[in-house]
Amino acid sequence: MSQEVLTLAQDLISRPSVTPLDEGCQTLMAERLAAQGFEIESMVFEDTTNMWARRGKEGPLFCFAGHTDVVPVGDLNRWHTPPFDPVVIDGYLHGRGAADMKGSLAAMVVATERFVEKHPDHNGSIAFLITSDEEGPFINGTTRVIDTLEARNEKITWSLVGEPSSTHKLGDIVKNGRRGSLTGNLTINGIQGHVAYPHLADNPIHKAAPALDELARMKWDNGNEFFPPTSFQIANINGGTGASNVIPGALEVMFNFRYSTEVTAEILIQRVLNILDAHGLDYDISWIFNGLPFLTGDGPLLDATREAIKQVTGSDTDPQTSGGTSDGRFIAPTGAHVIELGPVNATIHKVNECVKVSDLELLTQCYEVILEKLLC
């Protein structure tokens, strides 16, 4: 097995790029891509480093998308090896970001190098959209780069996001869509008072409980063949002063929807407001739109991905829309077809994150075959 993808993955992991830091990861990638004829454009927005690299001027435009930032390491004492000192143990590469997603970044670069060497006059264009703000607040990362590209009418045809999509073996699952995400921050207003004199107070917890129960039990939709039913989850709830003899003056509730294409954010918001109003609550509420649902159906990108995985691994893949959000939510609204394909996700965001070394080579081969099927 070639060592080039492993070596690059180790070089990337050794840089402690805890979000929103990049720590030179994009420079390392840019140097490799520039040698293949890519034009490199650094886009820095506040604390976030982004890279747009493109080879070719014509369409169609295939774009690898990913992030160089990683989540914090957590308790260092629980790591078997230093998280930013990547080592191979029993066939697995250990280190923060090994699976999410520096292994994918290395595979993208090496696959592109191999493809360009074999097909220097390929059709269309290849691009890389890389950010250091995917694990953080996602304000100055991919969304800002997309805004820049849209402003100059630079359109992505197909995008492959290197998020760790696989579950048990490489390529068993690809993400061909994601649910939308909507967060609500709700404050139920009451009147603070002494618990011995409830008639002089107004307990917001008691008032809110029936409404929250109705929201939790509500069936928002039935989903469809591509998406599970919309889910509502209360993520945080806080009320009271910490004293046992004080009725609180307010109750704060944070909740989140992961919603299908059967509803819109506007529909969900109105249904929530109707329930709160029906219970006669005095409340304040604000909303955070985290991303719209998207779906990539049958077509060149999904077909190429299926065929590549079958050719490289010998197994069929299962396109799904489950799981959390990714930066694909910012790319899809431009009209691009978006697929996520990456390593097994069993250890992502955990201590002792790792990826199977042989999977890095298989992933590289998958990426290269996808390029060949789309641009040759």
From Swiss-Prot:
The organism's place on the tree of life at top rank: Bacteria
Pathway: Amino-acid biosynthesis; L-lysine biosynthesis via DAP pathway; LL-2,6-diaminopimelate from (S)-tetrahydrodipicolinate (succinylase route): step 3/3
Protein keywords: Amino-acid biosynthesis, Cobalt, Diaminopimelate biosynthesis, Hydrolase, Lysine biosynthesis, Metal-binding, Zinc
Matching InterPro entries: ArgE/DapE_CS (IPR001261), Bact_exopeptidase_dim_dom (IPR036264), DapE_proteobac (IPR005941), Peptidase_M20 (IPR002933), Peptidase_M20_dimer (IPR011650), Peptidase_M20A (IPR050072)
EC number assigned by the record: 3.5.1.18
PROSITE patterns: ARGE_DAPE_CPG2_2
Required co-factors: Zn(2+); Co(2+)
A Pfam short name: M20_dimer
Gene3D superfamilies assigned to the protein according to its UniProt record, in alphabetical order: 1.10.150.900, 3.30.70.360, Zn peptidases (3.40.630.10)
Catalysed reaction, written as an equation: N-succinyl-(2S,6S)-2,6-diaminopimelate + H2O = (2S,6S)-2,6-diaminopimelate + succinate
GO molecular function: acetylornithine deacetylase activity; cobalt ion binding; succinyl-diaminopimelate desuccinylase activity; zinc ion binding
List of residues binding Zn(2+) 2: 100, 135, 349
Enzyme class label: hydrolase
GO biological process, one term: diaminopimelate biosynthetic process
Record-listed Zn(2+) 1 binding positions: 67, 100, 163
Cofactor: how and how many bound: Binds 2 Zn(2+) or Co(2+) ions per subunit.
Active-site residues annotated for this sequence: 69, 134
Free-text function comment from the UniProt entry: Catalyzes the hydrolysis of N-succinyl-L,L-diaminopimelic acid (SDAP), forming succinate and LL-2,6-diaminopimelate (DAP), an intermediate involved in the bacterial biosynthesis of lysine and meso-diaminopimelic acid, an essential component of bacterial cell walls.
Family affiliation: Belongs to the peptidase M20A family. DapE subfamily.
HAMAP family cross-referenced by the UniProt entry: DapE
Subunit-level organization: Homodimer.
NCBIfam families (UniProt xref): dapE_proteo (TIGR01246), PRK13009.1 (NF009557)
Record's protein name: Succinyl-diaminopimelate desuccinylase
Organism: Shewanella woodyi (strain ATCC 51908 / MS32)
